[in-house]
Amino acid sequence: MKNKKIMIRNAFLCLLIVVLLCSALFCVRYQHTSSKRLAERWRGDVIAQYHSPLDKDGDGMDDQVDILEGAINYVNTHPKYKSAYYAGGYPNDGYGVCTDVVAYALKEAGYDLMELVSKDIEIHGDMYDIEIPDQNIDFRRVKNLYVFFNLNAESLSTDLKDISEWQGGDIVIFKNHIAIVSDRRNQHGVPYVIHHANPFQKTYEEDILEKHDDIRGHYRWNNG
């Protein structure tokens, strides 16, 4: 009987320790995504960064680099993950989701994604699966951006072996997610992505492309 009590006590203590460790991990990771950038790990031939011929906002920085810098600058504000509706479309309370990384990246280059998507829905409404258009949220849905970029952006290879085709500032769309392609690469030459997937994400820049089998599209914004 005494041994049984000891076993029960030890089991309870082990369970308590596990619960405490899980709680600590939850507190450390929840909504504490780091904006620290990953190190460049590619040691092969130099892959020149693509530069767009466009400079929409006239700041002396081409659109491709502007979009990349816009994504980096946005995640440097440390947005917390939350899906919510905003009357003005763009989140203004320090929260956001994956589509907001892309929207703010394009905004820094001089493009209002909310307005662009809204106008495109007016023109190509039959291409979008939308019953009642709402410009405040339509541009923040991955399924709509998939249609939008297919219609309005340059569509590129989704083959990760074609590493030079993947450039910082490109846009990649997965089944239920979207991200900006980073200008830094892993040891295979495959670029990282800058994205916002969930409240437990360790860093905004992550090496995930090779882990995904659901890449639906790879795009470059050359529509000035």
Predicted regions and their residues:
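N-terminal Sec-pathway targeting helices
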Residues: 1-19, 26-28
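Low-complexity, Gly/Ser/Thr/Pro-rich intrinsically disordered linker/tail segments
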Residues: 189-224
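...with weaker cross-activation on analogous glycine-rich loops/strands in unrelated enzymes
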Residues: 122-200
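Residue-level marker of positions within ordered structural domains that often coincide
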Residues: 76, 106-107, 184, 198, ...
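N-terminal capping segments
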Residues: 29-146
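Bacterial peptidoglycan biogenesis and beta-lactam-recognition machinery
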Residues: 107-113, 185-187, 217
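Cell-envelope/ECM-targeting effectors and their regulatory/trafficking segments
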Residues: 19-20, 35
